[in-house]
Protein backbone atom coordinates (compact mmCIF):
# COMPACT_ATOMS: atom_id res chain seq x y z
CA UNK A 1 0.00 0.00 0.00
CA UNK A 2 1.38 3.41 -0.99
CA UNK A 3 2.06 5.76 1.91
CA UNK A 4 0.28 9.10 2.11
CA UNK A 5 2.31 12.27 1.65
CA UNK A 6 2.03 13.15 5.33
CA UNK A 7 3.14 9.67 6.40
CA UNK A 8 6.13 9.81 4.08
CA UNK A 9 7.08 13.28 5.26
CA UNK A 10 6.69 12.20 8.89
CA UNK A 11 9.02 9.27 8.23
CA UNK A 12 11.55 11.83 6.98
CA UNK A 13 11.24 13.73 10.23
CA UNK A 14 8.73 16.48 9.39
CA UNK A 15 5.42 16.32 11.27
CA UNK A 16 2.81 18.26 9.29
CA UNK A 17 0.14 17.59 11.90
CA UNK A 18 2.33 19.14 14.58
CA UNK A 19 2.72 22.18 12.34
CA UNK A 20 -1.04 22.59 12.09
CA UNK A 21 -1.38 22.12 15.83
CA UNK A 22 1.22 24.77 16.64
CA UNK A 23 -0.60 27.28 14.41
CA UNK A 24 -3.87 26.62 16.22
CA UNK A 25 -2.22 27.07 19.61
CA UNK A 26 -0.53 30.35 18.69
CA UNK A 27 -3.61 32.02 17.17
CA UNK A 28 -4.85 33.31 20.53
CA UNK A 29 -1.56 35.10 21.12
CA UNK A 30 -1.27 36.55 17.63
CA UNK A 31 -4.81 37.94 17.93
CA UNK A 32 -3.66 40.23 20.76
CA UNK A 33 -1.42 42.12 18.34
CA UNK A 34 -3.95 42.77 15.58
CA UNK A 35 -5.47 46.20 14.95
CA UNK A 36 -7.72 47.89 12.41
CA UNK A 37 -4.87 48.12 9.89
CA UNK A 38 -4.41 44.35 9.63
CA UNK A 39 -6.14 42.72 6.67
CA UNK A 40 -6.91 39.01 6.85
CA UNK A 41 -5.50 36.60 9.38
CA UNK A 42 -2.93 33.85 9.68
CA UNK A 43 -2.52 31.45 6.79
CA UNK A 44 -2.02 33.74 3.82
CA UNK A 45 1.09 33.83 1.70
CA UNK A 46 1.90 37.28 3.03
CA UNK A 47 0.88 39.51 5.93
CA UNK A 48 -1.27 42.45 4.85
CA UNK A 49 -1.20 45.78 6.64
CA UNK A 50 -2.94 48.97 5.51
CA UNK A 51 -0.55 51.91 5.78
CA UNK A 52 -2.28 54.97 7.19
CA UNK A 53 -0.28 57.99 6.03
CA UNK A 54 -2.39 60.50 7.94
CA UNK A 55 -0.03 62.86 9.71
CA UNK A 56 2.93 62.00 7.48
CA UNK A 57 4.08 64.42 4.78
CA UNK A 58 6.68 62.09 3.31
CA UNK A 59 6.41 58.67 4.97
CA UNK A 60 9.55 56.55 4.83
CA UNK A 61 9.56 52.84 5.64
CA UNK A 62 12.39 51.43 7.71
CA UNK A 63 13.13 47.74 8.23
CA UNK A 64 15.17 45.81 10.76
CA UNK A 65 16.04 42.20 11.47
CA UNK A 66 17.82 40.44 14.30
CA UNK A 67 17.86 37.33 16.44
CA UNK A 68 18.39 36.37 20.04
CA UNK A 69 21.77 34.67 19.72
CA UNK A 70 22.96 32.11 22.22
CA UNK A 71 20.66 33.38 24.94
CA UNK A 72 18.48 30.65 23.46
CA UNK A 73 20.76 28.04 25.08
CA UNK A 74 19.84 29.45 28.49
CA UNK A 75 16.13 29.20 27.64
CA UNK A 76 16.58 25.60 26.49
CA UNK A 77 18.46 24.57 29.62
CA UNK A 78 15.90 26.30 31.85
CA UNK A 79 13.06 24.92 29.71
CA UNK A 80 11.51 28.39 29.71
CA UNK A 81 10.39 29.59 26.30
CA UNK A 82 7.65 32.17 26.92
CA UNK A 83 9.87 35.27 27.17
CA UNK A 84 12.57 34.67 24.57
CA UNK A 85 10.18 36.01 21.91
CA UNK A 86 10.10 39.36 23.73
CA UNK A 87 13.87 39.50 23.24
CA UNK A 88 13.47 38.87 19.53
CA UNK A 89 10.98 41.70 19.09
CA UNK A 90 13.04 44.05 21.26
CA UNK A 91 16.22 43.53 19.27
CA UNK A 92 14.42 44.63 16.10
CA UNK A 93 12.09 47.40 17.23
CA UNK A 94 14.66 49.06 19.48
CA UNK A 95 16.89 49.39 16.43
CA UNK A 96 14.31 51.09 14.20
CA UNK A 97 13.32 53.65 16.83
CA UNK A 98 16.92 54.88 16.73
CA UNK A 99 15.88 56.54 13.46
CA UNK A 100 12.80 58.03 15.09
CA UNK A 101 10.47 55.48 13.50
CA UNK A 102 7.34 53.80 14.83
CA UNK A 103 7.30 50.00 14.34
CA UNK A 104 4.22 48.84 12.43
CA UNK A 105 4.52 45.12 11.77
CA UNK A 106 6.61 42.18 12.88
CA UNK A 107 7.30 38.71 11.51
CA UNK A 108 9.10 35.84 13.23
CA UNK A 109 11.08 32.87 11.96
CA UNK A 110 11.60 29.74 14.04
CA UNK A 111 13.86 26.91 12.90
CA UNK A 112 13.66 23.77 15.00
CA UNK A 113 14.86 20.19 15.02
CA UNK A 114 11.36 18.96 15.81
CA UNK A 115 8.10 20.86 15.96
CA UNK A 116 6.74 20.50 19.47
CA UNK A 117 3.49 22.51 19.22
CA UNK A 118 3.33 23.55 22.86
CA UNK A 119 6.92 24.82 22.80
CA UNK A 120 6.41 26.70 19.52
CA UNK A 121 3.25 28.29 20.93
CA UNK A 122 5.16 29.40 24.04
CA UNK A 123 7.81 31.04 21.87
CA UNK A 124 5.18 32.85 19.82
CA UNK A 125 3.41 33.88 23.02
CA UNK A 126 6.54 35.85 23.89
CA UNK A 127 6.78 37.30 20.40
CA UNK A 128 3.18 38.48 20.67
CA UNK A 129 3.82 40.01 24.09
CA UNK A 130 6.78 41.89 22.63
CA UNK A 131 4.59 43.17 19.82
CA UNK A 132 2.00 44.40 22.31
CA UNK A 133 4.72 46.23 24.24
CA UNK A 134 5.99 47.77 20.99
CA UNK A 135 2.48 48.54 19.69
CA UNK A 136 3.04 46.67 16.42
CA UNK A 137 1.22 43.78 14.75
CA UNK A 138 2.46 40.23 14.32
CA UNK A 139 1.32 39.76 10.72
CA UNK A 140 3.14 36.57 9.82
CA UNK A 141 5.83 34.07 10.56
CA UNK A 142 7.39 30.76 9.67
CA UNK A 143 8.18 27.64 11.65
CA UNK A 144 10.65 25.43 9.79
CA UNK A 145 11.34 21.90 10.96
CA UNK A 146 14.92 20.86 10.17
CA UNK A 147 15.34 17.14 10.93
CA UNK A 148 18.89 15.97 10.49
CA UNK A 149 20.24 19.52 10.63
CA UNK A 150 19.35 20.46 14.20
CA UNK A 151 18.96 18.38 17.37
CA UNK A 152 15.30 17.66 18.08
CA UNK A 153 15.14 19.80 21.22
CA UNK A 154 16.89 22.87 19.80
CA UNK A 155 15.61 25.88 17.88
CA UNK A 156 16.69 29.24 16.55
CA UNK A 157 14.63 32.41 16.49
CA UNK A 158 14.83 35.52 14.34
CA UNK A 159 12.53 38.43 13.63
CA UNK A 160 11.85 41.18 11.15
CA UNK A 161 10.11 44.51 11.59
CA UNK A 162 8.96 47.36 9.36
CA UNK A 163 8.31 50.84 10.72
CA UNK A 164 7.51 54.29 9.42
CA UNK A 165 8.90 57.78 9.99
CA UNK A 166 8.30 61.12 8.32
CA UNK A 167 11.28 61.93 6.11
CA UNK A 168 11.66 65.34 7.76
CA UNK A 169 11.73 63.68 11.20
CA UNK A 170 14.37 61.03 10.55
CA UNK A 171 16.85 61.53 13.37
CA UNK A 172 20.18 63.03 12.42
CA UNK A 173 22.98 64.45 14.53
CA UNK A 174 23.70 67.61 12.53
CA UNK A 175 22.88 69.93 15.43
CA UNK A 176 24.64 67.86 18.10
CA UNK A 177 27.09 69.98 20.06
CA UNK A 178 29.21 70.09 23.18
CA UNK A 179 27.01 70.47 26.25
CA UNK A 180 24.16 68.29 25.02
CA UNK A 181 23.05 65.78 27.64
CA UNK A 182 23.10 61.99 27.31
CA UNK A 183 20.21 60.22 29.02
CA UNK A 184 20.29 56.56 30.05
CA UNK A 185 17.34 54.18 29.86
CA UNK A 186 18.11 51.24 32.16
CA UNK A 187 18.28 47.68 30.89
CA UNK A 188 16.67 44.67 32.55
CA UNK A 189 20.00 42.85 32.56
CA UNK A 190 22.25 41.40 29.89
CA UNK A 191 19.45 41.69 27.28
CA UNK A 192 20.36 39.62 24.19
CA UNK A 193 24.06 40.19 23.53
CA UNK A 194 27.28 38.77 24.90
CA UNK A 195 25.89 35.37 25.86
CA UNK A 196 28.77 33.44 24.35
CA UNK A 197 30.98 35.17 26.92
CA UNK A 198 28.35 34.75 29.65
CA UNK A 199 28.28 31.00 29.02
CA UNK A 200 32.06 30.89 29.28
CA UNK A 201 32.19 33.00 32.45
CA UNK A 202 29.85 30.65 34.32
CA UNK A 203 30.95 27.47 32.45
CA UNK A 204 27.31 26.87 31.60
CA UNK A 205 27.94 24.43 28.76
CA UNK A 206 29.84 22.08 31.09
CA UNK A 207 27.84 22.77 34.24
CA UNK A 208 24.26 23.75 33.29
CA UNK A 209 23.11 23.26 36.89
CA UNK A 210 24.85 26.54 37.75
CA UNK A 211 21.80 28.27 36.27
CA UNK A 212 19.71 26.99 39.17
CA UNK A 213 22.00 28.47 41.83
CA UNK A 214 21.05 31.64 43.70
CA UNK A 215 24.13 33.87 44.08
CA UNK A 216 23.78 36.29 46.98
CA UNK A 217 24.34 39.22 44.61
CA UNK A 218 21.09 38.45 42.77
CA UNK A 219 18.75 38.95 45.71
CA UNK A 220 17.13 35.52 45.67
CA UNK A 221 16.89 35.09 41.90
CA UNK A 222 18.46 32.10 40.24
CA UNK A 223 21.27 32.86 37.84
CA UNK A 224 19.16 31.45 35.01
CA UNK A 225 16.20 33.71 35.75
CA UNK A 226 18.47 36.76 35.97
CA UNK A 227 20.05 35.95 32.62
CA UNK A 228 16.68 35.28 30.98
CA UNK A 229 15.17 38.63 31.99
CA UNK A 230 13.66 39.78 28.68
CA UNK A 231 15.15 42.69 26.79
CA UNK A 232 13.36 45.93 27.60
CA UNK A 233 11.33 47.45 24.76
CA UNK A 234 11.73 51.23 24.65
CA UNK A 235 9.34 52.09 21.82
CA UNK A 236 6.47 53.78 23.64
CA UNK A 237 8.45 56.05 26.01
CA UNK A 238 10.92 57.06 23.30
CA UNK A 239 8.16 57.95 20.84
CA UNK A 240 6.61 60.13 23.55
CA UNK A 241 9.89 61.98 24.01
CA UNK A 242 10.25 62.46 20.26
CA UNK A 243 6.89 64.24 20.19
CA UNK A 244 8.05 67.02 22.52
CA UNK A 245 11.86 67.09 22.63
CA UNK A 246 14.53 67.82 20.04
CA UNK A 247 16.28 64.46 20.28
CA UNK A 248 19.64 64.60 18.50
CA UNK A 249 20.62 60.95 18.65
CA UNK A 250 19.56 57.54 19.93
CA UNK A 251 21.72 54.45 20.41
CA UNK A 252 20.51 50.96 21.22
CA UNK A 253 23.23 49.43 23.41
CA UNK A 254 23.68 45.92 22.04
CA UNK A 255 26.74 43.85 21.11
CA UNK A 256 29.83 46.01 21.44
CA UNK A 257 28.50 47.80 24.50
CA UNK A 258 29.19 51.49 25.07
CA UNK A 259 32.27 51.72 22.88
CA UNK A 260 30.67 50.44 19.69
CA UNK A 261 27.07 51.60 19.93
CA UNK A 262 27.12 55.10 21.41
CA UNK A 263 29.41 56.46 18.63
CA UNK A 264 26.90 55.30 16.01
CA UNK A 265 24.66 58.23 16.91
CA UNK A 266 27.39 60.83 17.46
CA UNK A 267 28.22 63.68 15.12
CA UNK A 268 31.76 63.69 13.78
CA UNK A 269 33.94 65.67 16.17
CA UNK A 270 31.72 64.86 19.15
CA UNK A 271 32.41 62.40 21.93
CA UNK A 272 30.30 61.01 24.75
CA UNK A 273 31.91 61.94 28.07
CA UNK A 274 30.67 59.65 30.81
CA UNK A 275 31.86 59.38 34.40
CA UNK A 276 32.16 55.75 35.43
CA UNK A 277 30.65 56.47 38.83
CA UNK A 278 27.53 57.82 37.13
CA UNK A 279 26.80 54.50 35.40
CA UNK A 280 24.28 52.58 37.49
CA UNK A 281 25.66 49.07 37.04
CA UNK A 282 23.41 46.21 38.25
CA UNK A 283 24.84 43.53 40.54
CA UNK A 284 24.67 40.90 37.79
CA UNK A 285 27.40 42.64 35.81
CA UNK A 286 29.67 42.90 38.87
CA UNK A 287 29.14 39.17 39.44
CA UNK A 288 30.04 38.44 35.82
CA UNK A 289 33.16 40.60 35.93
CA UNK A 290 34.42 39.09 39.18
CA UNK A 291 33.63 35.49 38.24
CA UNK A 292 35.17 35.72 34.79
CA UNK A 293 38.04 38.05 35.71
CA UNK A 294 36.97 40.34 32.87
CA UNK A 295 38.63 43.75 32.51
CA UNK A 296 36.51 46.85 32.95
CA UNK A 297 37.20 47.86 29.34
CA UNK A 298 36.05 44.49 28.03
CA UNK A 299 32.88 44.68 30.11
CA UNK A 300 31.96 48.07 28.63
CA UNK A 301 33.02 46.85 25.19
CA UNK A 302 30.79 43.76 25.33
CA UNK A 303 27.78 44.35 27.57
CA UNK A 304 25.22 47.13 28.09
CA UNK A 305 26.31 47.47 31.75
CA UNK A 306 22.78 48.34 32.82
CA UNK A 307 22.06 50.86 30.06
CA UNK A 308 19.87 49.56 27.25
CA UNK A 309 19.42 52.78 25.29
CA UNK A 310 20.79 56.32 25.34
CA UNK A 311 19.19 59.53 24.07
CA UNK A 312 21.09 62.74 23.39
CA UNK A 313 19.07 65.92 23.95
CA UNK A 314 19.75 69.65 24.36
CA UNK A 315 20.76 70.54 27.92
CA UNK A 316 17.78 72.90 28.20
CA UNK A 317 15.37 70.02 27.44
CA UNK A 318 17.01 67.27 29.48
CA UNK A 319 14.75 67.65 32.51
CA UNK A 320 11.66 67.73 30.32
CA UNK A 321 12.78 64.56 28.53
CA UNK A 322 13.31 62.83 31.86
CA UNK A 323 9.86 63.89 33.06
CA UNK A 324 8.30 62.35 29.95
CA UNK A 325 10.31 59.15 30.34
CA UNK A 326 9.44 58.88 34.04
CA UNK A 327 5.74 59.29 33.24
CA UNK A 328 5.76 56.72 30.43
CA UNK A 329 7.25 53.55 31.81
CA UNK A 330 10.87 54.56 32.40
CA UNK A 331 10.85 55.84 36.01
CA UNK A 332 14.56 55.13 36.50
CA UNK A 333 15.89 56.97 33.42
CA UNK A 334 18.73 59.30 34.40
CA UNK A 335 21.43 61.68 33.16
CA UNK A 336 24.41 59.59 32.08
CA UNK A 337 26.86 62.07 30.60
CA UNK A 338 27.44 64.96 28.21
CA UNK A 339 28.61 65.59 24.68
CA UNK A 340 32.10 67.07 24.41
CA UNK A 341 34.53 67.77 21.60
CA UNK A 342 36.42 64.69 20.45
CA UNK A 343 35.52 61.27 19.11
CA UNK A 344 33.99 58.07 20.43
CA UNK A 345 33.33 57.39 24.10
CA UNK A 346 35.35 58.83 26.96
CA UNK A 347 34.81 56.91 30.19
CA UNK A 348 36.50 58.87 32.94
Where are these regions (language model features)?
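Glycine-rich phosphate/pyrophosphate-binding loop regions near the starts of catalytic domains
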Residues: 28-188
Amino acid sequence: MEKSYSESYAAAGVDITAGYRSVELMKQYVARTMNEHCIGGLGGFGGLFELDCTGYKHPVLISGTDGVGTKLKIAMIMNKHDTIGIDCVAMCVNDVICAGAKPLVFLDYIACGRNIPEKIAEIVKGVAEGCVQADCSLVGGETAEHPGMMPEDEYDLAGFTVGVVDKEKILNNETMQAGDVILALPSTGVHSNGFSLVRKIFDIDNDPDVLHTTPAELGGKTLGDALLAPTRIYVKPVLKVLEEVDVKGISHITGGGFYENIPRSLKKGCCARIKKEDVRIPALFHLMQETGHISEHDMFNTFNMGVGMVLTVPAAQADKALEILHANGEPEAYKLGVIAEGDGVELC
